[in-house]
Amino acid sequence: MRVLAIDPGAKTGIALYDTDTKFLALEIIPKGLEGFQRWWSFKGPLMLDNSVTIVCESFEAEEGTHGLDLTPVEIIGWLKGLGVPIHWQRRNQRGKGKLITPAVLKRAGLYPKRGELKEGHQVAALQHLLAYLVKIRHRPTIELLHPKEAS
């Protein structure tokens, strides 16, 4: 199973994971909607042709330290306009009750290595992706993230 997760924003985080091969790719797409559209025009058809499940953070606009940024809403609206099936994750679902923390990702070997992490949005996208797999009860992912203690 291949899953693509999107953490939309001015710098959009992307995580692509293949549960069979354990292939993981993380990206940052700068320049908001324009950058994401450019990225999608190149990679989107590849995702759709390869039966990739798409997961995206739903977004509730709230004012942050730098004011109100509606870039995520623009990206979500554009994705909805494509008519592509998307599984929506609320922001607070990504942690699944703190089950998918950076420490858990590191223990599972999924946290980006030093120098590979460009923005926290990559990790947020990965957390959305894994929260989706836990939600659908993908057993190998659950066991990878939370192996039973050795007896």
Describe the role of every protein-language-model region.
Residues M1-S151:
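Phosphate- and other anionic-substrate recognition elements at nucleic-acid/protein interfaces
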